[in-house]
Curated annotation (Swiss-Prot):
Keywords: Cytoplasm, Membrane, Transmembrane, Transmembrane helix. Signal peptide: none annotated. The keyword Transmembrane applies. Its main location: membrane. It is found in: Membrane; Cytoplasm. One of its GO terms (cellular component) is membrane. The keyword Lyase does not apply. This is Uncharacterized membrane protein C18E5.14c. It comes from Schizosaccharomyces pombe (strain 972 / ATCC 24843) (Fission yeast).
Length: 127
């Protein structure tokens, strides 16, 4: 029989791996867009992508800091908290972390689409 702790660790590993893959894919797509010659012809688009990459790095650093802070809180939690309460708080934080990751991913995807739409309208006006 597999213990519940092992399943928790596997669940956490899969969740972290999937969110990290989403972040890496987003950075790769931004880099590919930024270095593409087709998009380099518009200076405002290049400025927007640079600014977006900076915001993206800030969000990734915030999430990493969030994980480190709550990881240390769980390691150094007082013994007075019951195991049920610790598990309950832990699951709430895992849910919040997943929600924040999903919201940031959707926001970054929406921002990328709006940048592309802005570039298309600007490019159409120039032609």
């Amino acid at each position: 029989m597999i213990s519940l702790t092992a399943l928790d660790l596997l669940d956490e590993l899969l969740n972290d791996s999937s969110s990290n893959m989403i972040w890496l894919y987003e950075v790769y797509m931004l880099y590919k867009t930024y270095t593409s010659y087709f998009f380099m012809s518009s200076k405002s688009f290049v400025r927007g992508v640079k600014r977006y990459l900076i915001y993206f790095c800030y969000c990734a650093n915030f999430i990493a800091l969030f994980r480190v802070i709550f990881g240390t809180i769980f390691v150094y939690s007082p013994d007075g908290i019951t195991p049920f309460m610790t598990d309950f708080v832990r699951w709430i934080l895992i849910y919040l972390k997943g929600s924040i990751n999903s919201l940031l991913y959707m926001a970054s995807f929406t921002k990328q689409i709006s940048l592309l739409r802005g570039w298309r309208t600007e490019h159409a006006e120039l032609s």
